[in-house]
Amino acid sequence: MKIFGTDGVRGKAGVKLTPMFVMRLGVAAGLYFKKHSKTNKILIGKDTRKSGYMVENALVSALTSIGYNVIQIGPMPTPAIAFLTEDMRCDAGIMISASHNPFEDNGIKFFNSYGYKLKEEEERAIEEIFHDERLLHSSYKVGESIGSAKRIDDVIGRYIVHLKHSFPKHLNLQSLRIVLDTANGAAYKVAPVVFSELGADVLVINDEPNGCNINEQCGALHPNQLSQEVKKYRADLGFAFDGDADRLVVVDNLGNIVHGDKLLGVLGVYQKSKNALSSQAIVATSMSNLALKEYLKSQDLELKHCAIGDKFVSECMRLNKANFGGEQSGHIIFSDYAKTGDGLVCALQVSALVLESKQVSSVALNPFELYPQNLVNLNVQKKPPLESLKGYSALLKELDQLEIRHLIRYSGTENKLRILLEAKDEKLLESKMQELKEFFEGHLC
């Protein structure tokens, strides 16, 4: 049975993520990390979901039962776990979060001792241990060999200092009015502190988590409220994070949501202007707009494509010796400061860009026009191989003949089919998307 999806393990708390399942997974992961253990410490953080307590306690029980010492740091962004795992010399880090999913879901993400997400072969190794009944039951410790657990509440300060170091030392935010939407999630404490300490005039919304309101009509997936607040407050910028703050959506001074590909383009060129790029390559996923590639080429930069998912962006960056890349969804990686997407690092870089451009954000963050794209997330009841659907190949052939770029795939974390179309003719795009929706609704819904 395959346990891992495209971003760790994710599912409905109490259904897939039961205490027994989580404990078994915790033992399996712990035994895997034991093979290369240096400090016998594992760090655990979480977002603000109510089920986080259940999952955390199950993991702590599992890891201490095989001799690991566990450090619990409470609600913190996913990128903070990646940073602190390496900074605190832990064998591994674990983030309990389902990211942008509703509060009923939860998930578990693993990081190695260097703060990187696990590769697929490492996940498969954990799955093999998970299914090895004899190994699991022979691994429990007794007496003094059982591990300990302790909670540390002040590590947020380390992460705040780290974030501030990512911001240019010759700048401050005193001239900027900024609205932050923390999605009632993991950034609700740290984001306001960072921006306030750097001098910004800050308004914070959706910063009162109650365990059940994470991502609820707010944050990166629902930035309309942020857009309204930016206009009402006459702010220079608005930043919306998702539940675990590894994703960022930016709103300009006019209340417009800045497209993720425009953000990648303008930030890449900004990094080049500071001689901060380690190579001429910038990494983006196959969902990126063709206009991004053309814009970067005009700036003597090369776009490298990779599979969808920020861990694949990170791997592709390492392969191409690049230190900047991301997804149009808002997972943007500055690897000099973060091993995974970090919404706060990205927000600080956007702020610096706007300051140094000496332009309003609606101008500074609008470097090129995009080709029309249409993205639909279709709820599905089953996930058969797309190639097995009668008429599917003919549909793709027709799209190719019409010069409509297409990317159709199942979500790795939800029961959804993602359909992306891109073409120069917007009306043609809309009509073909309607055809595709009807086709897939007939086969999958």
UniProtKB/Swiss-Prot annotation:
GO terms for molecular function: magnesium ion binding; phosphoglucosamine mutase activity; phosphomannomutase activity. It comes from the Bacteria. Signal peptide: none annotated. Mg(2+) binds at residues 99, 242, 244, 246. One of its GO terms (biological process) is peptidoglycan biosynthetic process. The modification Phosphoserine is found at residue 99. GO terms for cellular component: cytosol. InterPro entries: A-D-PHexomutase_a/b/a-I, A-D-PHexomutase_a/b/a-I/II/III, A-D-PHexomutase_a/b/a-II, A-D-PHexomutase_a/b/a-III, A-D-PHexomutase_C, A-D-PHexomutase_C_sf, A-D-PHexomutase_CS, Alpha-D-phosphohexomutase_SF. This is Phosphoglucosamine mutase. It comes from Helicobacter pylori (strain P12).
